């Protein structure tokens, strides 16, 4: 296994387009790291530079203690799993998994041992004689992972490996990948645009936008303490609600003026906006859907209560999404499925002020979480 070090990594194409800009990251041995972001953010390009499939324009890449900028992909001791399984259709599962080892002229008895061990780990033993066309999508992806496992690489690189699977299979394969990481203790770098995959799988997540790292942190910290407006909106589904608010300061206290009402800020949050000189300024106020309440018990103790008319009601089993407007801003509340609110109803709701996020309107950087 191995650690990785990426220092000031840049990728600039001949036409001048900067796909990755000054990328800096230290990845620990056996860490499961996720690159996440929208299409075109540079996450797959970064993975391909690590693999050696893209040239690095500038910067230094180390795998372990070895600088590998100019090392051929086959000599980097890595294995890749792609979105497309890339299996040989005329070969059995066994031969697909063994193919790379045969090319490296590994002794036949060692190949047999390595393939069967990988098949056991991935629950493929009963399928070793089958051709890819006789397998389900999930089974094919497990074969692709098995082909990577038998190489016993220092680092696994996975580029959106679950994108071609249906929703149920994606959940199953997420669990399989998590188990695989625990069992093998490998370093894994995993690219996805799906923030649910990122949150459930990663030890740490690298959020990217326009080739630039926005934040690197644990899943919980990314969700609870986003560094900026982009991260706050990207991580979480439904996404965080955003409204414009004006800061009002009175002595050591501060509040946010939203839709004609004042929301008092907790002391720690008030201190941050006062020290930042935001009195009288417009800021962006963020609140996650699960921190918007319609329950009478919460509203009775809330310091600021709003009213709005429900536009859309979505039942998702144990919970309901309520969609409504506050002033000109669309909001979503994630509430208990026992709610009596329905479209057309005017309901009272309140925010959990301890969970408020405040962002600078111009820089979009967080002021306080």
Residue ranges and their predicted role:
Residues 36-38:
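The feature captures the beta-strand-to-loop junction immediately N-terminal to the Walker
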Residues 73-230, 234:
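ABC ATPase nucleotide-binding domains
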Residues 54-62:
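Conserved post-Walker A/P-loop segment of ABC ATPase nucleotide-binding domains
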Residues 16-18:
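Short coil-to-beta microelement around the adenine-binding A-loop and adjacent beta1/P-loop entry
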Residues 253-310, 340-369:
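Glycine/charge-rich catalytic "coupling/switch" loops of P-loop NTPases
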């Amino acid at each position: 296994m191995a650690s990785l070090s990426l220092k000031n990594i840049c990728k600039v194409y001949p036409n001048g387009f900067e796909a990755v800009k000054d990328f800096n990251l230290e990845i620990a041995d056996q860490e499961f790291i996720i690159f996440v972001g929208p299409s075109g953010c540079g996450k797959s390009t970064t993975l391909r530079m690590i693999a050696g499939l893209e040239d690095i324009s500038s910067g230094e890449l180390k795998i372990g203690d070895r600088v590998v900028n100019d090392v051929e992909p086959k000599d980097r001791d890595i294995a890749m799993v792609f979105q497309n399984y890339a299996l040989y259709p005329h070969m059995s599962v066994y031969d697909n998994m063994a193919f790379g080892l045969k090319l490296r002229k590994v002794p036949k008895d060692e190949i047999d041992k390595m393939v069967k061990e990988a098949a056991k780990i991935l629950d493929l033993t009963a399928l070793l004689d089958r051709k890819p066309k006789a397998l389900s999508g999930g089974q094919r992806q497990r074969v692709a992972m098995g082909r990577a496992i038998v190489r016993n690489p220092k680092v696994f690189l996975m580029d959106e490996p679950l994108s071609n699977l249906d929703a149920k299979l994606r959940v199953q394969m997420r669990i399989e990948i998590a188990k695989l990481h625990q069992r093998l203790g490998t370093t894994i770098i995993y690219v996805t645009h799906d923030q649910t995959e990122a949150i459930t799988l990663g030890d740490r997540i690298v959020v990217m936008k326009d080739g630039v790292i926005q934040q690197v942190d644990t899943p919980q910290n990314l969700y609870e303490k986003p560094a900026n407006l982009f991260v706050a909106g990207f991580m979480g589904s439904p996404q965080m609600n955003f409204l414009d608010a004006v800061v009002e300061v009175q002595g050591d206290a501060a509040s946010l003026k939203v839709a004609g009402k004042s929301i008092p800020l907790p002391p720690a949050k008030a201190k941050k906006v006062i020290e930042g000189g935001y009195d009288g300024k417009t800021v962006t106020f963020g609140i996650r859907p699960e921190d918007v309440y319609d329950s009478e018990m919460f509203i009775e103790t809330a310091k600021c209560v709003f009213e709005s008319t429900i536009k859309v009601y979505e039942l998702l089993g144990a919970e309901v999404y309520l969609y409504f407007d506050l002033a000109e801003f669309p909001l979503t509340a994630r509430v208990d499925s026992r709610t009596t609110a329905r479209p057309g109803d005017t309901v009272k709701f309140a925010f959990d002020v301890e969970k408020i996020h405040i962002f600078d309107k111009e820089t979009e950087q967080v002021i306080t979480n």
